[in-house]
């Protein structure tokens, strides 16, 4: 049987823990055929590990999209988009491609960085991506920006933000709480317009978790492409990334990536799902 084809529109992380590299590793683990339209290249200073983001020329970006659309993706995922023009184009491409699913990972900062890459991108995401997305996967910071509610510090805050984001047009909202809400458990909140669900796993090591957000969104996309419902895909992706985080490893003195192969090679983590 032919593999489902999945396109990631994302940046390249030269350290290969996040970005399109994380997406392709995840796609391979979950039996979908991954394609890439590159938006930018992220490099790191070898002394400080500060990030430098170099955008891809728009003409080259368009040629990548033409190639990918001609192949015919079943699902599309976005990661670091970088500019408002690329954000708008990503939304248009989903419609043009005829893909069944559109997963938006609303990347706003690089791991370890504090400043939003481009403040104007938030409004562009709200206008061009959220109304078309099947699933949106913000972390607490990104959910606070997309909802306009600012800092989120509790499950109740997450519920309010999820409702606001849902009202902007995305039928499935999953907010990643991660380590911010509790030291012993990892809590995410999923909302489908009808019911809120809390997804819980044990809290694993957090020193080596580079690429966790990209991996979660990529896994969600792969599971959707292979036939799971949005709720099933999100729960399965939570289990996949939990295994990857638990088995993260030290790359150098600055960073350590998650282990994208841990779910298939080492262990599968149980996810507790409760209505809240």
Curated annotation (Swiss-Prot):
GO terms for cellular component: cytosol. It catalyses: pyridoxal + ATP = pyridoxal 5'-phosphate + ADP + H(+). ATP binds at residues 139, 176-180, 188, 213, 238. Mg(2+) binds at residue 142. CDD domains: HMPP_kinase. Its EC number is 2.7.1.35. Disulfide bonds: none annotated. GO terms for molecular function: ATP binding; hydroxymethylpyrimidine kinase activity; metal ion binding; phosphomethylpyrimidine kinase activity; pyridoxal kinase activity. One of its GO terms (biological process) is thiamine biosynthetic process. Keywords: ATP-binding, Kinase, Magnesium, Metal-binding, Nucleotide-binding, Transferase. Belongs to the ThiD family. This is Putative pyridoxine kinase.
């Amino acid at each position: 049987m032919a593999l489902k084809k999945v396109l990631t529109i994302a940046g390249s992380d030269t350290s290969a823990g996040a970005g399109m590299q994380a997406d392709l590793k995840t796609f391979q683990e979950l039996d979908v055929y991954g394609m890439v339209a590159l938006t930018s290249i992220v490099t790191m200073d070898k002394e400080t590990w500060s990030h430098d983001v170099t955008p891809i020329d728009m003409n080259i970006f368009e040629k990548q999209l033409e190639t990918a659309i001609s192949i015919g993706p079943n699902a599309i995922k976005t990661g670091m988009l970088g500019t408002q023009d690329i954000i708008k184009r990503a939304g248009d491409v989903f419609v043009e491609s005829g893909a069944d699913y559109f997963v938006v990972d609303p990347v706003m900062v690089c791991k370890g960085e504090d400043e939003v890459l481009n403040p104007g991108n938030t409004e562009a995401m709200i206008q061009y991506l959220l109304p078309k997305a099947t699933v949106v996967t913000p972390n607490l910071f990104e959910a606070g920006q997309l909802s306009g509610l600012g800092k989120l510090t509790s499950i109740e805050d997450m519920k309010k933000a999820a409702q606001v984001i849902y009202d902007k047009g995305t039928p499935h909202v999953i907010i990643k709480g991660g380590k911010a809400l509790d030291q012993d458990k990892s809590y995410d909140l999923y909302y489908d317009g009808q019911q809120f669900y809390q997804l819980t796993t044990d809290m694993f090591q957090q020193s080596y978790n580079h690429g966790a957000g990209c991996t979660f969104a990529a896994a969600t996309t792969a599971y959707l492409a292979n036939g799971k419902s949005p709720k099933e895909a999100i729960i399965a992706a939570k289990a996949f990334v939990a295994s990857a985080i638990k088995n993260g490893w030290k790359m150098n003195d600055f960073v350590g990536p998650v282990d994208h192969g841990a779910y298939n090679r080492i262990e599968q983590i149980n996810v507790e799902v409760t209505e809240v």
